[in-house]
């Protein structure tokens, strides 16, 4: 009998629970997700390269191929827009609020928005420094000296045709290549944090839900990223390398999260949130000043492009809704 007369079987003893050997819940799920995400994302990254850059295909000279790539890129633009507004930003804001609450920090200053702005200005400053350096080094084409809020270079030739406007010869312009690199970096960094979320999970069911959602999400993002890099006129080898890098980031995050699951604290979470906020700010810049202006700059097939943009947005919205 217990001290208050209850039967001994109904008395809960914490020491009895603590004496049980710890079981790594969901570890096999995390390892399986690591392999599946690596393989699936890599395959999805290479599919656009194999289809659009086949040996012997005159990609640059084919107007129909350029139009098809432009339409598919509009769909990818919708995916990136949904990723920015419905995935990166909410994840970042929730993570940093949780970290600050765990540290018992109350702010009067909008720190979350300030970190976003710093990521935004980071890309802006990098681009302007690059443009200033090229302008001082020698004469540059008209496209490279235009304001970044105007027509965006690096797109297909027929997008900016007009009297008296010199056209690019197929080589990527510096701002477009730089933006492509920043896009890869921001997505890669966010992928590491998404992998960390899976690796830090201790519940088997929740880990499986996150893994399935990431499999669909990363597959679509991998295809969209490769299309965007091809649209920037980067070499196929460079696009493939970026795809491999992007494919490795989420598995890397899963591995790190599984290793750090027992030692993660509020300070670690705050540092992670700051980095994720910087990445979200850079992605915000790329989405609204690179991807959307470039896809909607052409006067051809405007309605179809808007429909595809909305379709891409709706697809990722549906995936995120299922994930919730």
From Swiss-Prot:
Effect of residue 217 to A: Does not affect membrane localization. Decreases zinc uptake
Superkingdom of the organism of origin: Eukaryota
Cytoplasmic side: 52-68, 126-179, 228-237, 294-303
Tissue distribution of the protein: Ubiquitous. Expressed in most adult and fetal tissues including the epidermis.
InterPro entries: ZIP
Compartment(s): Cell membrane; Endoplasmic reticulum membrane
Record keyword Membrane present: yes
Effect of residue 158 to A: Does not affect membrane localization. Decreases zinc uptake
Induction notes from the record: Down-regulated in prostate cancer.
Species: Homo sapiens
GO cellular component: endoplasmic reticulum membrane; membrane; plasma membrane
Stated name of the protein: Zinc transporter ZIP1
Main location: membrane
Segments traversing the membrane: 31-51, 69-89, 105-125, 180-200, 207-227, 238-258, 273-293, 304-324
GO MF annotation list: inorganic cation transmembrane transporter activity; signaling receptor binding; zinc ion transmembrane transporter activity
Activity regulation info: Inhibited by Ni(2+) ions. Fe(2+) ions do not inhibit zinc uptake.
Reaction it catalyzes: Zn(2+)(in) = Zn(2+)(out)
Gene Ontology biological process: embryonic cranial skeleton morphogenesis; in utero embryonic development; limb development; monoatomic cation transport; zinc ion transmembrane transport
